[in-house]
Each structure stands twice: as C-alpha cells, then as structure tokens.
Amino acid sequence: MRYRKTEIWKSVDWITILLYLIMVIAGWFSICGASYEFDNVGLFDPSGRPGMQMIWIGTSLTLIFVILMLESDFFDIFAYLIYACVIVLLIATIFLAPNIKGSHSWLVLGPIRLQPAELAKFATALAVAKFMNGYGFKLTTVKNFSITLFLIFLPMVCILLQKETGSALVYLAFFLMLYREGMTGYILLIGVCAVVFFVTGMKYSEVMVGITPLGELIVSCLVLLITMGLVGSVRKDYISVKIMLGGIASTFLIGYVVSLFVPVNFAWISIGLVGAASIYLFYLSIRNWVWHYALIALFALGSIGFLFSVDYVFNDILEPHQQIRIKVSLGLEDDPSGAGYNVNQSKIAIGSGGLSGKGFLNGTQTKLKYVPEQDTDFIFCTVGEEQGFLGASAVLIVFGLFILRLIVLAERQDNAFGRVYGYSVASIFFFHLAINVGMVTGLTPVIGIPLPFFSYGGSSLWGFTILLFIFLRLDASRKER
C-alpha cells in the first residue's frame, strides 16, 4: 500500500531536527549579540540583521515543509537536472556577479543577494549519489572513479573562477565520503602529505643550517620515511626496507664525516637518496612484475617535485591576500593590524569570555565592532565572548552529536543513493565546522567559510537546510519500501 504522506512526520528523524533547531536558535541569538548596537531599534526589526535572519529562518521552515512533502524519488529522478542547472548558474555567476570584496560569487537581484556556491553543495551530493547508485557501480574502476571526480571538481573549478577559494575547498570533504565507499586510504594519505609538505616547506623555507635548507631536508627525510613505510605496509617487503634503511644511514654517516672538513648540503643528499630509492623500487617493480613498487616510487618522486613547486604555487598562483593569511597563520609574518587583525581580535574576544562568558549582549569586543565579519565567518568568537568556554564547548558538543547522528542515519540506509548522500552531508558539515572554528582560533588560515546555522546569511542557511532535509526525507522514505 502506498505510503501516506501524512506519515512522514512519524518517520522523519526528530533527533536530527531537534539538533537542527537548537543550532538555528543558538545561531540567531549569536547574531543578535554580534549585531547589537547601542541605539538598536529592536531585535525583530527587519532592517537589522537579527530581524532579517529571522525572515531567513521562517523561509527555511517553508523549504523544510516543501522538501518533506516531496516524493523521495524526486531527488533521484531529477538529480542530474538539478546538478546541471546549478552548474549553469555557477558559470553565469562568473560573468554576471559584481565584484564584492574581491570575488564574483554573489548574484544581486535588487535587495536580494544569492550565492549559488551554497546551493551547489547539495546539487553535487545528489549527482554523485545518483551516479554511485548505478547498477554494478564499483568505485575502484578507473572510469567510475574518474567520472565521480569530474562531478565533484566541476563545481569546484567554477567556484574557484569566481575567486571564492574557501567555498571551493569545501568540495574536498567529498573525499571522506569516497573513503567510506571504498576509495583507497592512500589517496587520503597523499592529501595529508601534500598539506604537511606545503606547510613544512613554507615554514622552514628560509631557515638554513650551515648551507642546508632546513625545509627541504625535513620534507625529503619525511618522504624517505613514508616511502619505506609504504614498502613495508603494502608489500610486506621488510628485506627491501632494511636495504633502503642501511643505504640511507650509511650515506648520511659518510656525509656527516665529510662535513667535518667541508660544508655539506644534507638536503641534496636526502633528495639524492629519494632518487636512488625510486630507481631501486622501479627495478623491483620490473623484476617482480609488481606495480605497487612503481607507484611508491612515483609517490616519492612526485613529493620531491611538489616540494620544489611550493614557491611557485605560493608566489604565482595564490592571491596576495591569501599569501599574507598563510604567512600569518604559519608565524612567518606578524601583521596584527592587517591580515592578522581578524584572528587577533577574535582570539581576544574568545579569551575575554573566560569560563562562563560576559552574558548575552554584553560582549565588549563584539559590541564595539572590534572583530570584522563577527556575525558571519567569525560568529564563533561571539559565542566564546558572551557564553565563555562552557558555551563554546556546548556548541561544539551539539555539532559533534549532530554529525555523529548523520553518520548513524547514513549507515542505516538500504540503498547506495541515500548512504552516499548522507555521508556527503556529514562530511560537508564536518569540514565547515573544523575549518571555521580553526580559522577563528588561529589554527588554520582565514579562508572565509561560514559556520553552519550560526553565520548570518540567507544563502548559507538555505543551502545547509536544503542539504540536510533532503537527506532526512531520503531517510524517512525507508519505510515506504
């Protein structure tokens, strides 16, 4: 018998909805605290940000009702069409959007501003979920993996062309979902290594030990260690590991003895050892007809190539404001009144909140507008100042429970479409939370992404609400089958 739509309210996951409402309400109060002015005419006045956010919340509730009343098959049937429409909208935004703070990511329609990048997240998740739900789909085949990456990277490239780097980086969160669906963990390892090598190469690029560049030495030594670890873990070839370790140790020992008489660049010795290890691995690959050795060798050589490309990427590809933010985050440059101003004022606001905070509407740093973007990207510092460590911890706990609940719901799906979409949703929320909180506390560079359900803005709230409640509709439909 056809599942009755009136039963949707019984089958929908009310735990997730409760957590959603808690965060939306807490977010509205945080916006009130961040936007409060001494001559404020009223928190519900639509001319102010709290009043406007209340309107966005009301329209979001309407969106929730519409989504839950739709048949769950709607999202499967029209996934590609929704994705195509959003891609067209992203491309149009590149050419039609005005320059706002250096990016072309907002479509302005009279008093309304819309950021299509926020809507692209759920559209991409739907398209990827539909493709991976295909008959006989296996992520391990080159064709399927390539098409999946294309679906993820196409909107990412469009958003990069809008000069909205922060929103584009969010799409890297899909790799967490791909890992759950069978992608090898070595791809995640490559991503982690790229970040570590970039940060290390940048932070110690100008530090010299004698004539040895410390950054190049550290990275090349890490490459050697990881290469030997991969040979041992992937192939269980401990004899080759011992041979490589012996060669590396003896070469460094000889270099040390020589350095007692003449200056020696140990970085070049280490890089040379990476090359020698790669040649040895290629030899093993050809001799034993095992392609794993060749892949490990390519990883080692690619890592060294990446190391030498760091300066080019940093100086010629990244925008000047991005370069300054990275330098400030790594401690390479002190700019308390420039690029580092936001983060410094944010940390002052959070620190001044103490254990229990200054109370609602009593935050001096936020009330006096010391923190730029304090009701959008830096909204978390308002929580820290007004509610203190306890309030900030409570917000993180609620977010943690929310993401864990999404994972539980994703795992209980009876088809790949719902599971893939669910893990995409959980991954996106996790990425936003980790980067935004890290950004506000100075742990990560400032890339300008909102804190879900807390940051001011209709596009952000709508985007996250649609993203979430499509999944809740898919989850509720399990009882229809």
Identify the residue ranges that each predicted region occupies.
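Helix-boundary and loop/linker segments of multi-pass membrane transporters
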Residues: 8-9, 145, 368-371, 413-414
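Long extracytoplasmic/lumenal interhelical loops at the membrane interface
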Residues: 350, 354-387
